[in-house]
C-alpha cells in the first residue's frame, strides 16, 4: 500500500528555508494531456485512440473544468484558484489560493471545448448535458485584455509592480531563480511582473495556427 508523496514544501537554496509548494494548483496539466491527444490523432489520423479511452479522458477532464468554471455578474465564466505554467505566481499579493482567469488555462479550455463540439458533430457520443454546458462556457470564458489589446497572464496581472532586472543582475549576477532571491529578501514574486515559464506566450505556440481562437 502506497502513501501520499505529493510535494507540499520545497527548499529555497538561497536562504535554506523550506517554503510552501503550491504547484498542485497547476490544473492546466490535464489540458496539455488532451492537447497532446489531439496532436497524436492529427498526425497519425488514427482515431481509434479516441474510442480506446481517449474520449473518456476528454469527457472526464471537461466535467472537471465545467464544474470549476463559475458564471460571474459580468456574464462571463471565471476560473479561480489555479496556477498557470508560470510557477513564480502562486497567488495574489498577500493572499493564498491561486490566481483567477489564467489566460493559458482559459484559452486552452476554450480550445478543448471546441474540440469536444467537433467530436460530437463527427458522431462521437458526448453526454447531452455536458455538451450543452460546454456550448455556454466556451464562448464566455473571461480574459483580461488591456487597452492595447495585450492579453494579461491572468486577471489583474498588469496591476503588479515591474522588476528592475538590471539592479538584480548587478547585485547577484545569476538571476535565473530570481524568485528565490526575492523571497530571501523578504518579498514575493507574486507582487511583480516576472515569469519563470512561458505562460501566455505558450498559447501562441499551441494555438497560433488557429488564429488564437478568433472570436472565442
Predicted regions and their residues:
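The feature captures the catalytic groove of carbohydrate-active enzymes
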Residues: 2-52, 64-139
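Active-site core of glycosidic bond-cleaving carbohydrate-active enzymes
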Residues: 35, 52, 106-110, 114, ...
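Conserved functional hotspot residues or short segments at active or partner-binding sites
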Residues: 58
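Short conserved active-site loop signatures built around small residues
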Residues: 55
